[in-house]
UniProtKB/Swiss-Prot annotation:
The lineage of its organism: Bacteria, Pseudomonadati, Pseudomonadota, Gammaproteobacteria, Enterobacterales. During stationary phase, binds the chromosome non-specifically, forming a highly ordered and stable dps-DNA co-crystal within which chromosomal DNA is condensed and protected from diverse damages. It protects DNA from oxidative damage by sequestering intracellular Fe(2+) ion and storing it in the form of Fe(3+) oxyhydroxide mineral, which can be released after reduction. One hydrogen peroxide oxidizes two Fe(2+) ions, which prevents hydroxyl radical production by the Fenton reaction. GO terms for biological process: chromosome condensation; intracellular iron ion homeostasis. Coiled coil: none annotated. This is DNA protection during starvation protein. One of its GO terms (cellular component) is cytoplasm. Its main location: cytoplasm. Homododecamer. The 12 subunits form a hollow sphere into which the mineral iron core of up to 500 Fe(3+) can be deposited. The keyword Oxidoreductase applies. Its EC number is 1.16.-.-. The gene is dps. PROSITE patterns: DPS_1. Belongs to the Dps family. One of its GO terms (molecular function) is DNA binding. It catalyses: 2 Fe(2+) + H2O2 + 2 H(+) = 2 Fe(3+) + 2 H2O.
């Protein structure tokens, strides 16, 4: 059994780490990271909602495409949440936090056509892709900016694929 303790630093609510990123930079970065964790969790759930409930032309292609998107989104959300902890923060990923903090409009539960889902998804992917790109310039920590850049590339590609399927 481990006897290790989580020790908070004296001047902050951060958990002690030997990571030498400046404390004020850590705090600001953690705030941005947690904002994006919230967005990615919500986007992954929205993606699955569409994946399960769409019907119509090109169903199987879009259905399978969305599965791949969700897997990648979940991978990025995990990397971003783990970066929060690496910097001494607490990753905020509960349903309650997501519900309280998401900037995404509530996903319509009364749509069924592939086209209606694609339009609703495009709106939400656009919000997250644009915020991810904005976040790259908001942080001073280069490792975090690199994580955001990788996620941004995927989100832009996913948005392009979604928009390319809208008739």
């Amino acid at each position: 059994m481990s006897t290790a303790k989580l020790v908070k630093t004296k001047s902050s609510d951060l958990i002690y780490t030997r990571n030498d990123v400046a404390e004020d930079e850590k705090k600001a970065t953690i705030e941005v990271l947690n904002r994006l964790v919230t967005e990615l969790i919500d986007l992954s759930l929205i993606t699955k909602q569409a994946h399960w409930n769409m019907r119509g032309a090109n169903f199987i292609g879009v259905h399978e495409m969305l599965d791949g998107f969700r897997t990648a989104i979940t991978d990025h959300q995990d990397t971003i949440a783990e970066r929060v902890v690496q910097l001494g923060g607490v990753a905020l990923g509960t349903a309650q936090v997501v519900n309280d903090r998401t900037p995404l409009k509530s996903y319509p539960l009364n749509i069924h056509s592939v086209q209606d889902h694609l339009k609703a998804l495009a709106d939400r992917y656009g919000v997250v892709a644009n915020d991810m790109r904005k976040a790259i310039g908001e942080v001073e920590d280069e490792d975090t900016a690199d994580i955001f850049t990788a996620a941004s590339r995927d989100l832009d590609k996913f948005l392009w694929f979604i928009e390319s399927n809208i008739e």
